[in-house]
A protein has these predicted regions:
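N-proximal short alpha-helices
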Residues: 1, 19, 37-38, 137, ...
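Hydrophobic, aliphatic-enriched repeat segments that assemble into extended interaction scaffolds
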Residues: 1-2, 173
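Rossmann-like dinucleotide-binding domain for NAD(H)/NADP(H)
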Residues: 96-201
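Rossmann-like dinucleotide/phosphate-binding beta-alpha-beta segment
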Residues: 3-95
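Short amphipathic alpha-helical surface micro-motifs
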Residues: 1, 23, 41, 130-132, ...
Length: 201
């Protein structure tokens, strides 16, 4: 893999599976549109019409695990998603799969992942988040040659920082005016919070 500066596979023609298909994975799908990828997406909160706009096929959780060559995790951390990917789920994956986690560390059972990587049951992983951050020096993930680790900063660029502050201020201004911020993530609270969506103004 890339630790040895060896790239042994092409993305072209591969199947990319998304677990969670909100704003960030939708942006990823747009950015990868030139690679002739097949997209599978599992997200009960996103309509099939939204997925179709990005040429993503709605799929079950198990279908994504079993069919994807690359699986990218994009779920919030809740009681339901803690260790969403564990030993059972890793055993459903293809042996050539690359697993990417940029969501939240505890969504993935690290011990089960270490075992799958050590036994070469999956091809590799790229992790920007961990169950314990910073990743302990003693973590066996640090010793593996088929995993790429970044310390929860893989997306940081000058543009990202500028956009972060812009959207943060925009969200505060929206709420001060009684509007829901565009980036809210808990729709179950919308009716109780007293804020309205801008499109309902």
């Amino acid at each position: 893999m890339c630790k040895d500066l060896v790239w042994d596979r092409h993305l072209h023609g591969s199947t990319l599976g998304f677990i969670g298909f909100g704003r960030i994975p939708q942006c990823v799908a747009r950015k990868l549109s030139g690679f002739d990828l097949r997209y599978l997406a599992y997200d009960p909160q996103v309509s099939p019409d939204v997925m179709a706009e990005l040429q993503a096929s709605p799929a079950t959780f198990e279908e994504v695990l079993q069919q994807a060559d690359v699986i990218s995790l994009h779920t919030p951390l809740t009681e339901a998603t803690h260790h969403l990917i564990g030993e059972r789920e890793l055993r459903l994956m293809k042996s050539n799969v690359i697993l990417i986690n940029t969501s939240r560390g505890p969504v993935l059972d690290e011990q089960a992942l270490v075992e799958a990587l050590t036994e070469r049951r999956i091809a590799g992983a790229a992790l920007d988040v961990f169950e314990t951050e910073p990743l302990p020096e003693s973590s066996p993930l640090r010793q593996l040659d088929n995993v790429v680790l970044t310390p929860h900063i893989a997306g940081y660029t000058d543009e990202f920082v500028k956009d972060f502050w812009h959207y943060s201020v925009e969200a505060v201004c929206d709420m001060a005016q009684g509007f829901l911020p565009e980036s809210y993530v808990n729709p179950q609270a919308v009716d109780r919070c007293g804020f309205v969506r801008r499109d309902q103004d």
